[in-house]
């Protein structure tokens, strides 16, 4: 990021942010808390943009090994799930669970069916040095009919398994622990844990604290409050049970346990609102509150899994790499960023630490290769060894910082980053998550669509402010991944127009309308690498005169006649209005000027006042099957209201469609539906796109042209095809149609067995609901994409103003002209102060 300080504009921007945050509740914490969090958890707080990589900067050579899972290759598999049981200096032990494909049909005697005839429970013991499998132990052969393997752990040279069995006669569960020698497979010890509910709970994590081993399990009391049970094994093998429980407090997670010497340990426990700290006496099992001030400098929300080295150093993984804890100096130190190697970060970011030091480490775990068009859930187990290189192969290059929330990057984007870094002579992309801290927000009281939208607006407003301020001060990232929902940034002060790097594409080869609709005031700030479709999935015959959407009058008719008066858009008036406003925002804000005096603004407001419920239903009410049915299709977040009994639930659904599979599944669930229409508007416009993966480039980037080269890379045929075959809507028509044909073939075959409609009243599958798909359905989906009329990139700060100012009009307390004038003035001030 260029250090060009635009002082006057930055000063005005700070004033604008103060106004935006004032419109929010005090729940947040301001943009400052987002960009400069005082807690440390491994995430870097300062940009490295523009820094030149030196030869002695960290770089790690890697070796990736895929472990062959010992299953019967002659039997078709339903799924496998491998996971790490434990590791020491001799062996790595992996537990693989799963099932072979079971029979189907009415001729199966399910009452006497033994599921364990198809179960997979195998322990693989690998030599620590050679990585060869030296022993496989089949746990299924000794399982009782109603038993299953709950967990397995490997510590102190022995494997400990937990088997839980259900008793048909007493309707009770009992658990047995078994110690097994890893090489001979012989049983060393067996313990009946009885039918105590706590002792039957799954072991969640195992920690090594000095000479002690601590197993943790989460439980719930009669009031549904979560608490933890700790099983402490001392150096002599004696075991003690300790409860970590506090009245009225839900303890949801223990990410790590800190050894502080003298047989004492500190337990950080995540609750619904914050982190509590407890001191555990390992000798006598007593637990007391710890001094939080001694440990609250640690950001436990960013800690994923941990490893305690033989010297007592605690290393832990974060969303962007590996850090270690320095208790003495109360800080953490990043020793590895997932960018500092040649392995795709989307693979290694989900693995566990097997061992770690400053000079090398081992990650291992499940690698689930997602393929939406294959009927298989078989996972690989991989081991990746990293060793610090003698010199950095990218020395001399300058760093381009890519911001991604929580450091999340999918496989295709990850591959593109690696390709760019290998081919660029002058620049190196490094991913950070400096603005991902939303731990200040309380989600426990969210119980409706309105609640969720209000909180999302507040979070997005503060995220936008934090990014905008740092960009203007020359301290922000160069490339921004997936920030299309931060509409405030769509301004030449913050982002560059990417149109020159895309060029003039052929509309016959690309969905150029998607790029046009993504523009704001003629500029392409957010490049939609792939995208979703937002709208109302229904039958094309219900469309208004435009054929792609509804005017407010047409939707009112559709609502009252077809939907029997119950809207499928589950929002209250204020939130509903912001949806309609953002769908037509180019009518109300043009070139930084707000105008809410138009007939279009009045029409939307009057429609909402006359036809929309004041507040959205609570989720408690929605999930009451006497009142509402939640859609069971693949569409995320879709809801269908039952309304009166005569209302047909298969008429329409308001949803976000993520790909061809999602489109097909909605066709099946809502038999006869084949299109996605726009939400109510004044001109009957079509549905909107919402970027699923988007790229933006800062106006203050270290080198805009270098960032533009990365954007070009994402439009390449290989990337577009790979994204399309991962069930995403892409810009390339050829890639879209090629993936569509693969989807048609799959869902007309074995994939269709899992794509059936469900009766919303009973939740049971509907007979004969399977559909036969064809190339015509691909044509229909292509027409839907062509009909899209805008991009969802709302400005959260403006949303918050509209929610506050329009409410008195909807309640009948003020006239529309009055509230529109006030809202317009407030919005204009925000726009002016942004520059």
Protein language model regions, located:
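Short, well-ordered beta-strand elements
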Residues: 396-408, 427-434, 479, 525
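Repeated scaffold domains used in trafficking and secretory/extracellular systems
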Residues: 77-86, 143-155, 195-210, 248-260, ...
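C-terminal capping/gating helix-and-loop segments adjacent to ligand/active sites or protein-protein/ligand interfaces
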Residues: 689, 752-827
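Extracytoplasmic "Venus flytrap"/periplasmic binding protein-like
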Residues: 434-510, 644-654, 666-667
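Hinge/lid segment of periplasmic solute-binding proteins
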Residues: 482-535, 673-680
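Periplasmic-binding protein-like
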Residues: 542-543, 564, 713-744
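Extracytoplasmic/periplasmic substrate-binding proteins
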Residues: 611-709
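Helix-loop-helix "hinge/cap" segment bordering the ligand-binding cleft or interdomain interface
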Residues: 127, 131, 157, 503, ...
């Amino acid at each position: 990021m260029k250090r060009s300080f635009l002082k006057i504009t930055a000063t005005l921007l700070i004033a604008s942010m103060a106004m935006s945050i004032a419109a929010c509740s005090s729940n947040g914490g301001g943009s400052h808390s987002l960009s400069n969090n005082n807690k440390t958890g491994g995430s870097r707080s300062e940009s490295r943009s523009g820094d030149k990589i030196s030869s002695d900067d960290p770089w790690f050579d890697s070796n990736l090994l895929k472990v062959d899972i010992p299953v019967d290759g002659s039997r078709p598999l339903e799924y496998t799930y491998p996971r790490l049981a434990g590791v020491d200096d001799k062996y790595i032990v992996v537990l693989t669970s799963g099932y072979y494909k079971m029979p189907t049909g009415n001729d199966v005697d399910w009452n006497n069916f033994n599921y364990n005839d198809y179960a997979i429970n195998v322990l693989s013991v690998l030599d620590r040095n050679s990585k060869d499998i030296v022993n496989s132990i089949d746990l299924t052969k000794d399982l009782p009919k109603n038993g299953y393997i709950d967990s397995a752990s490997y510590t102190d040279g022995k494997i400990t398994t937990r088997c839980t069995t259900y008793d048909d006669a007493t309707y009770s569960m009992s658990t047995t622990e078994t110690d097994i020698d890893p090489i001979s497979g012989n049983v060393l010890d067996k313990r009946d844990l009885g039918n105590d509910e706590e002792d039957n709970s799954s072991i969640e994590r195992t920690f090594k604290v000095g000479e002690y081993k601590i197993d943790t399990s989460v439980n719930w009391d009669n009031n549904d409050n979560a608490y933890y049970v700790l099983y402490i094994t001392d150096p002599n093998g004696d075991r003690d049970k300790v409860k970590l429980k506090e009245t009225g407090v839900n303890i949801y997670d223990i990410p790590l346990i800190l050894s502080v010497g003298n047989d004492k340990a500190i337990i950080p426990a995540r609750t619904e609102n914050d982190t509590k700290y407890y001191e555990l006496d390992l000798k006598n099992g007593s637990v007391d509150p710890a001094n939080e001030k001694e440990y609250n400098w640690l950001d436990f929300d960013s800690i994923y899994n941990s490893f305690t080295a033989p010297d007592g150093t605690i290393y832990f993984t974060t969303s962007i790499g590996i850090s270690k804890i320095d208790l003495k100096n109360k800080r953490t130190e990043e020793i590895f960023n997932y960018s500092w190697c040649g392995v795709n970060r989307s693979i290694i970011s989900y693995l566990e630490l097997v061992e770690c030091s400053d000079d090398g480490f081992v990650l291992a775990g499940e690698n689930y290769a997602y393929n939406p068009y294959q009927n298989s859930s078989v996972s690989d187990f991989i081991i990746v060894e990293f060793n610090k290189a003698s010199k950095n192969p990218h020395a001399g290059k300058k760093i381009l910082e890519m911001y991604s929330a929580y450091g999340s990057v999918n496989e295709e984007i990850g591959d593109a980053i690696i390709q760019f870094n290998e081919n660029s002579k002058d620049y190196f992309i490094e991913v950070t998550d400096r603005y991902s801290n939303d731990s200040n927000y309380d989600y426990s009281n969210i119980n409706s669509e309105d609640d969720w939208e209000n909180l999302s607006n507040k979070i997005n407003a503060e995220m936008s402010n934090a990014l905008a301020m740092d960009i203007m001060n020359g301290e922000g990232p160069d490339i921004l991944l997936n920030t299309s929902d931060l509409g405030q940034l769509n301004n030449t002060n913050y982002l560059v127009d990417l149109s020159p790097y895309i060029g003039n594409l052929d509309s016959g080869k690309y969905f150029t309308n998607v790029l046009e609709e993504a523009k704001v005031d003629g500029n392409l700030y957010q490049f939609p690498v792939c995208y979703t479709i937002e709208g109302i999935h229904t039958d094309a015959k219900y469309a208004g005169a435009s054929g792609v959407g509804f005017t407010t009058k047409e939707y009112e008719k559709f609502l009252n006649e077809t939907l029997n008066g119950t809207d499928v858009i589950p929002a209250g008036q204020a939130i509903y209005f912001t949806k309609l406003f953002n769908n037509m925002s180019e009518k109300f804000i043009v070139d930084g000027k707000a105008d809410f005096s138009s007939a279009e603004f009045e029409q939307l407001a009057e429609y909402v006042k006359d036809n929309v419920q004041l507040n959205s239903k609570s989720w408690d009410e929605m999930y009451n099957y006497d009142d509402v049915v939640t859609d069971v299709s693949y569409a995320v977040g879709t809801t269908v209201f039952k309304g009166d009994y005569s209302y047909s639930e298969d008429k329409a659904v308001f949803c976000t469609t993520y790909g061809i599979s999602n489109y097909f599944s909605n066709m099946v669930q809502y038999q006869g539906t084949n299109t996605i229409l726009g939400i109510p508007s004044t001109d009957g416009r079509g549905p909107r796109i919402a970027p699923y993966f988007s790229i933006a480039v800062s106006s203050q980037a270290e080198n805009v042209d270098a960032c533009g080269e990365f954007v070009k890379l994402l439009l390449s045929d290989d990337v577009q095809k790979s994204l399309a075959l991962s069930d995403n809507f892409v810009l390339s028509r050829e890639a879209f149609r090629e993936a569509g044909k693969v989807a048609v073939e799959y869902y007309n075959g074995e994939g269709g067995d899992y794509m059936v409609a469900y009766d919303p009243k009973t939740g049971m599958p509907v007979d004969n609901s399977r559909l036969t798909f064809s190339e015509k359905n691909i044509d229909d989906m292509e027409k839907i994409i062509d009909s899209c009329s805008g991009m969802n990139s709302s400005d959260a700060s403006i949303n918050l103003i509209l929610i506050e100012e329009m409410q008195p009009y909807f309640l009948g307390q003020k006239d529309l002209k009055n509230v529109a004038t006030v809202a317009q003035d407030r919005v204009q001030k925000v726009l002016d102060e942004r520059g």
